[in-house]
């Protein structure tokens, strides 16, 4: 693992030395365990179980040698549990957007920041670490599979990094080396295997204006007070959310595949032919072909034909699959909606079902908030983000509780609370404005009537 100090050792040397370091940096990054875990996380998130894909069934021949089984069924299915778990956490915490204390954060981070922070959260959960680049009022999100961080050995802060991308192995490798005082563009391709500078180092901010005296455009270059790329994690361990549940997902998928394979294999009917020992393999094949076509057979004398099938022991497999599914929800602290999807569920039961998810989201929220504060520091503004979690509620019970508290709550709070329960929080201000306008009109008419009298 290379650090910021390793980069400083070559930062002031010639470009060839720098490009050699950058190429080695990316190579080591791709060979690291964390990078491989990030790639696997993206595969599981996309519904591709890499463990199952690599799994090969074998059979043993008469010599006791293991050879690939190319005859029996070999289904390779993968559950999308990890996708559901990540989406659930992201949607519940960030689905309603971010509310700002004074509005400066929304102005500084851009109108689409709600979408960008959801992307950062998703990548952090899946890959273990995401990165947000504050690009002059716009946020760009990178994953661990496309950005090499260089942390300072002394204070632990991110001080530099290389963002890289390559469409295909036979296409050019593009690299943006990002430092405190600017960024440099490099490219590696078949004509330039050692790389070349595609764009010289330049500052992150370019301010252009026209001089009235000289009549020409003048540019001013600036940088940010801190490194404009900040890390984002999803948990205190700074690891992918896949790690603690991967083995359980593999077990679930493996048993599901075995279940399907057994059903497929057992669905085949095999035939027992009595008193026909003289039939060779060719005769047996001809017999089976006729059975498939005619569904009937002629037998002589004391010969007989009997169809047989195999019953799959499905009860034990269904039991273990059900147990593994419950274990997945428990270990991932996800909400099993089946617990609250049927019947009349009280608000207390809903809160109890949400408790594990809320506990996980408390830690997730702390990491997201830290990520946002780091971006605000780069932008040079101060604000406080808050979140409205998107959770299922018993609307009738909740609204009745609000109405029963009318004596101690003001009308604006009650309106906001009820509309949030109904899913219309974004329309609260419009309703409050219309009600205020109605009250003003009512007072105006009342004053007019008083003057007339």
Where is each model-derived feature located?
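Extended, helix-rich architectural segments
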Residues: 1-139, 453
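Extended, regular secondary-structure scaffolds
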Residues: 121, 125-230
């Amino acid at each position: 693992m290379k650090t910021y100090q390793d980069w400083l050792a070559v930062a002031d040397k010639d470009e060839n030395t720098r490009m050699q370091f950058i190429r080695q940096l990316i190579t080591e990054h791709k060979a690291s365990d964390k990078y491989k875990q990030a790639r696997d996380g993206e595969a599981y998130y996309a519904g591709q179980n890499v463990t199952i894909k690599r799994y090969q069934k074998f059979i043993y021949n008469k010599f006791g040698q293991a050879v690939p089984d190319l005859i029996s069924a070999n289904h390779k299915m993968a559950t999308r549990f990890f996708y559901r778990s990540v989406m659930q956490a992201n949607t519940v915490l960030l689905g309603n957007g971010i509310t700002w204390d004074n509005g400066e954060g929304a102005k500084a981070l851009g109108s689409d920041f709600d979408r960008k922070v959801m992307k950062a959260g998703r990548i952090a959960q899946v890959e273990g670490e995401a990165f947000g680049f504050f690009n002059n009022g716009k946020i760009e999100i990178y994953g661990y599979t496309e950005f090499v961080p260089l942390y300072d050995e002394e204070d632990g802060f991110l001080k530099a990094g290389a963002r890289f991308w390559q469409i295909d192995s036979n296409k050019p490798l593009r690299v943006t080396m990002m430092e405190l005082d600017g960024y440099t563009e490099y490219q590696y391709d078949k004509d330039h295997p050692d790389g070349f500078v595609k764009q010289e180092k330049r500052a992150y901010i370019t301010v252009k204006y026209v001089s009235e005296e000289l009549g020409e455009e003048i540019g001013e270059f600036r940088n940010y007070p801190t490194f404009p790329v900040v890390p984002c994690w999803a948990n205190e361990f700074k690891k992918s959310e896949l790690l603690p549940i991967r083995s359980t997902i593999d077990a679930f998928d493996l048993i599901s595949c075995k279940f399907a394979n057994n059903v497929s294999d057992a669905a085949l009917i095999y035939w027992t032919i009595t008193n026909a020992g003289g039939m060779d393999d060719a005769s047996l094949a001809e017999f089976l072909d006729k059975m498939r076509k005619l569904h009937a057979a002629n037998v002589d004398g004391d010969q007989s034909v009997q169809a047989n099938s195999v019953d799959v022991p499905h009860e034990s497999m269904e039991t273990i699959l059900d147990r593994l599914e419950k274990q997945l929800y428990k270990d991932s602290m996800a909400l099993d909606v089946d617990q609250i999807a049927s019947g009349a569920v009280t608000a207390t039961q809903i809160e109890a079902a949400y408790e594990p998810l809320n506990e996980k989201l408390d830690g997730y929220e702390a990491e997201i908030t830290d990520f946002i504060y780091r971006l605000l520091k780069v932008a040079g503004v101060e604000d406080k983000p808050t979140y409205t979690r998107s959770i299922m509620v018993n609307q009738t019970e909740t609204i009745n509780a609000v109405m029963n508290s009318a004596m101690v709550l003001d009308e604006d709070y009650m309106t906001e609370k009820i509309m949030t329960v109904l899913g219309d929080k974004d329309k609260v201000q419009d309703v409050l404005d219309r009600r205020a306008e109605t009250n003003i009109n009512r007072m105006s008419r009342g004053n007019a009537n008083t003057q007339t009298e």
